[in-house]
Amino acid sequence: MISPVVISRLIDEKKSMENGAILPQAIAQPQLCPTKPALARRDGVSMHRRFALSPDRLGILTPSDDQGLETEPLSTGDNLGKGSHSGFSSITITARRVGPPASSLVWDTFRDPLCPKCKAKDALFQEPPVLAGDAHLCQHNRPFTCTESPSNGSVEGMKVFQAHSRLSARQDYWVTHTNDNEDSFSSDNSPSRKVPLVFSSCVHFRVSQQCPNAIYYLDKSLSVPLERPQIASPKMHRSVLSLSLRCSSHQLTADGVDSSANGEPISTALSQELSEGKQDLLGPQWGQPQGGHWKESPALVPVHLGSGTCPRTGSPPLENVKFADVGRNQVPVRKEKEDHATCTSSSHTNQLSIHIPGWSYRAETKVLSGSKKQQQEAQRTLPAFPVGQKTIKHFPPEGDSSPSSDGQPSILSESNERQHPYFMIPRVPLPGFYCPLQTGCASLQEDGAVQIETHFPKDYTCCDLVVKLKECEKNEDPTVTPEPSPATPSPSTPEGAQSSDPSEDSYEPLLASSMTLQEALEVHRPQFISRSQERLQKLKRMVQQRKTQQKESLGQKQSLLPVRANKKQFTIPHPLSDNLFKPKERCISEKEMHMRSKRIYNNLPEVKKKKEEQKKRMILQSNRLRAEVFKKQLLDQLLQRNAV
């Protein structure tokens, strides 16, 4: 954190240099200790070192295994860079701007002034960031090289170089710049024109061509206060992501010199507008601001990536750079391509990937094809994903996408894009790639830029990537409406479709709009109507036959029964109807009553028991009689034997 004392000292130095040189005051950073070689995978290399600015002095925080974080005071002596630490640590640079109270500021968006240091040393930033509207912040990482062993393919080590000179092109420094009409940051000297309060920062480093197929992780954050100004107008922050790509080739042009000597930069810049009336574009961390709290937000991060040859001449795959952030915002990316005479198309894929987890992505494509420069725009708005999800979207090379001569993408590319509308890692193509991303979805415009430029010596090729992020917040304002996006031009239709009969084309919508269902059936399905009419007639005939049969059956029944004058005539109901006739209960005769009573009496349990006992007595009596008869017969036989 930069204390107010340091800022006031810088302001005093600036006031003394108002009539002198234009170059703003620079604070030199110390030389970094070179890190030891660390083993890593071939596809992943990360460099981390932590910096911090003390309130009373500038210092470097380096990780220590025994004592934690140690502060090394800044100095320009010869004792810099003596100690060495194993492994890598992350680079964290923070700054605080002490300015007028929030009530005297107007939160708005404006174009940042150019950074003279960046513009003089490296034409990479077309629009460097501004710190707090008055202070200009620009931080550069030193270039580092990462040598790769050809035998095993593993990374041998990483070295961080720096220059002791203050005016070195790759020296880390903080630049503080104020306008001429403002001489302090205090609230007493507030400017007459209320300046927007903007917080931003940048990181700039270059990757050598000796590290193909490597992944570098950058972590650049910026502390931003969340307190709001006390004004009646809608209060909001603004979020911007800017990408800048540069690539140079050492190949010779037709006149025998390289492209840098000819001064033929491929420089294209686009801008996107962010509608400030959309509430769902804001991340959850910007919901309710709290006084005295600070929010870390991503800032400007330029990255230089290198390859052995021109990206469009079939060189090995370029490094993949991934940026990690936990916000949920819209990341606008707009790409523009110009055909260059020194580079030829190839089937090899050299791609650059940006990974921002949890962010929505919308890409707008504008293609300039050759000298015709026919433009084509496409937009896509995607919902945010959980932080853990990582889906990769690939942009095929220009040779594989087979675009038409006027910059129109193929229909197959459009269908593929519609089938996969959600992705998290947009692939930013280099200046030899064609982006087929197209959709007609209307969404909000956002600020951002992608620049592709050739401005490097001919001994190596390098690609630079600049990322500029600003967080945004706003109150719900129903009067603000989102700005509709331009419609995507539809691809040209083939000649065969255009040569079709115009009468048929006009007849189809006429049928769909003016015809009724019956008319449409008569035209397209005449047999359906005829069959329906036949079924209706058949049902009517069946009803008539049923009625005649019922009348005949009723006449026969009435003729069989005698007609009695004294008997009331009742209608005979249908047997299946619910309205059945119930006649009177008839009278029971005496005989029937006696039989009924006897049947009930015999079924009584006492009567049944009595009948069983009586039956047993009859059986016993018959057995006695049989015994007497047997005795008598036996006696007679004995008497006859004796007589003989």
From Swiss-Prot:
Residues 598-629 form a coiled coil. Residues 62-83, 305-349, 367-413, 475-507 are annotated as: Disordered. Induction: Upon DNA damage by agents such as ionizing radiation, UV and actinomycin D. Activated by p53/TP53. It comes from the Eukaryota. The keyword Nucleus does not apply. Residues 398-410 have a biased composition (Low complexity). Pfam families: ALMS_motif, Centro_C10orf90. Residues 481-492 have a biased composition (Pro residues). Tumor suppressor that is required to sustain G2/M checkpoint after DNA damage. Acts as a p53/TP53 activator by inhibiting MDM2 binding to p53/TP53 and stimulating non-proteolytic polyubiquitination of p53/TP53. Exhibits ubiquitin ligase (E3) activity and assemble ubiquitin polymers through 'Lys-11'- (K11-), 'Lys-29'- (K29-) and 'Lys-63'- (K63)-linkages, independently of the ubiquitin-conjugating enzyme (E2). Promotes p53/TP53-dependent transcription of CDKN1A/p21, leading to robust checkpoint response. Mediates CDKN1A/p21 protein stability in a ubiquitin-independent manner. This is (E2-independent) E3 ubiquitin-conjugating enzyme FATS.
